[in-house]
Amino acid sequence: MIKINKKNEPRELREFREKCESNGSLCKKSYEKFRDENPTGFEALQSSLTDEQHGLCCYCMKKIAPYKEKKECEEQLTVEHFKPKSKYAHLCLTYSNLLGCCRGKIGKIKHCGRSKGNKELGFIPNPAERGFDASIIEYKYNGEICINS
């Protein structure tokens, strides 16, 4: 994992979230609504995440890119909710909770966001939070990511 320096969130995401908050409709399905009904905003979100992360998956650092910009050597970016929507619906459109990750599957083996699923990674800090120190992350030969002891 690398430290991710978050920049300003895309305008479309901010406006959509503020609209949901003001009319009381913010829920875990708000993200899907944003993705499905606001393609321009969703593309802006993907591009912003890709730029901040230098085109790398937030977990394994594999090269990623938004679907429309993907080259043959890159994985398609998936928007990852670091804190899962199932438990933290109020964070589903919070930019600091959104990261870019790879599709997370090699054959039948799941990794990264696909392996994480709806679990909370309490022991692994959000790489976009202040004070994140990449040196505390250890990578095992089997691909496991854990805290350096």
Residue ranges and their predicted role:
Residues Y59-C60:
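Short, cysteine/histidine-rich loop/knuckle motifs that typically chelate Zn2+
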